[in-house]
């Protein structure tokens, strides 16, 4: 269960969380928080429904295998398989195409951002840093197997949570809560939906989670609820702190305020958080 929670947290929380306030500043802390919670609830229901479909197909497959004298199969029932069983061949093609395109775009963004963080620290050019990041993590996943990837993901997730807690703690210390923009322009909240929706998505992991937990719906539900609740809490905390630091001005970077007060320690903290977030998302 811990592995599933770490997988969801690591995949959901990316370096983009630190820029969340740019889209929520106009709405204010409370309207933005309400929007975050509403979208999280919708996506949670969606994830639980996907899990039900996946496990139902898994059981159908196992029943068919038992009739032919074979046991349980550990092969993951993918989103494409789910689409094929529920929407037909056209649905499978559409889902496979969209997922492949999304994966390519997201991985490219992760590698590019990782190179941006690593290149100055290692005194390398961006292409070399990008290659090192890809080979190091990709090689570990490819040759180390599932257990090694799981151990690495859990380690990076703990580092992610620790660095994030330090960032929020620093922001809380330097923030002037009397100037907090609690209720800005509630009418602006709908404009934040696309960004928040994209930030909270983790549904491509559902087939892997169902297979990893052998179709145990109780554990699957627990893993999804706990794993998605942690990023929600992180987003709510950082959004409140960031909007308080920025005074509701989307052009003000709260990280710059923290960096000015903390100096070089802030740069190390931000780099550590960014690399941990990118590493877990990549895995």
Model-identified regions with their sequence ranges:
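Hydrophobic transmembrane alpha-helices that form the core helical bundles
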Residues: 44-60, 72-124, 270-283
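Select transmembrane alpha-helical segments in multipass membrane proteins
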Residues: 1-8, 87-102, 183-194, 261-279
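Membrane-interface "cap" regions at the ends of multi-pass membrane proteins
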Residues: 1-27, 43-48, 59-67, 74-76
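Juxtamembrane helix-boundary/capping and inter-helix hinge elements in multi-pass membrane proteins
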Residues: 26-30, 55-63, 73, 86-90, ...
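Alpha-helical transmembrane segments of multipass membrane proteins
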Residues: 35, 42-47, 230-238
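The first (N-terminal) embedded transmembrane alpha-helix
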Residues: 2-19, 106, 134, 198-202, ...
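TM-loop-TM module centered on a large, flexible mid-protein loop between adjacent transmembrane helices
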Residues: 69-89, 231-279
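Helix-loop-helix junctions that connect adjacent transmembrane segments
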Residues: 124-257
């Amino acid at each position: 269960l811990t592995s599933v929670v770490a997988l969801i947290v690591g995949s959901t929380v990316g370096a983009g969380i630190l820029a969340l306030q740019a889209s929520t500043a106009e709405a204010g802390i409370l309207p933005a928080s309400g929007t975050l919670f509403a979208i999280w609830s919708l996506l949670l229901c969606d994830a639980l429904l996907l899990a039900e479909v996946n496990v139902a197909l898994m059981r159908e497959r196992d029943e068919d295998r038992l009739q032919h004298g074979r046991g349980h199969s550990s092969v993951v029932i993918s989103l494409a398989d789910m689409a094929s069983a529920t929407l037909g061949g056209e649905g499978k093609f559409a889902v496979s195409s969209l997922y492949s395109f999304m994966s390519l775009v997201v991985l490219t963004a992760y590698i590019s951002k990782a190179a941006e963080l690593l290149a100055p620290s290692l005194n390398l050019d961006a292409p070399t840093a990008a290659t090192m990041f890809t080979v190091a993590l990709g090689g570990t996943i490819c040759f180390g197997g599932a257990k090694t990837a799981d151990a690495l993901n859990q380690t990076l997730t703990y580092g992610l949570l620790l660095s994030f807690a330090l960032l929020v703690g620093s922001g809380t210390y330097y923030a002037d809560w009397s100037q907090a923009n609690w209720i800005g322009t509630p009418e602006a909240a709908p404009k934040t939906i696309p960004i928040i929706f994209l930030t909270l998505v983790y549904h491509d992991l559902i087939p892997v989670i169902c297979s990893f937990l052998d179709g145990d719906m109780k554990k699957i539900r627990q893993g999804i609820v706990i794993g998605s609740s942690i990023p929600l809490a992180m987003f709510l905390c950082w959004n409140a702190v960031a909007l308080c630091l920025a005074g509701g001005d989307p052009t003000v970077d709260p990280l710059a305020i923290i960096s000015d007060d903390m100096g070089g320690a802030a740069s190390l903290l931000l780099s550590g958080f960014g690399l941990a977030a990118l590493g877990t998302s990549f895995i």
